[in-house]
Amino acid sequence: MTNVIVMLEAEDIARSQRIDARNKAITLLPSAFGARDIEDHYMRMFAFNMEMTQKYGLPADGNWYIDSDTGAVVRDD
């Protein structure tokens, strides 16, 4: 059973979708990105997750993920 913690605001959903799209592209075509681009992407993703943790009061244990399609922050039990 999924446990929705909170729903993101529209602007944060859009940012999450951009990160998710880039993540999928890197996964599918890693050779199209340089090592620096991939590292920068993961640093931006980490910073975004930290920002969302603080903004929405999410658990610091990190056992959650953002469903980019719906904007739901889901507890990953």
Language model: regions and residue ranges:
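Contiguous, amphipathic alpha-helical segments that mediate oligomerization or scaffolding
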Residues: 1-57
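Amphipathic, charged alpha-helical segments and their helix-to-coil junctions
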Residues: 43-77
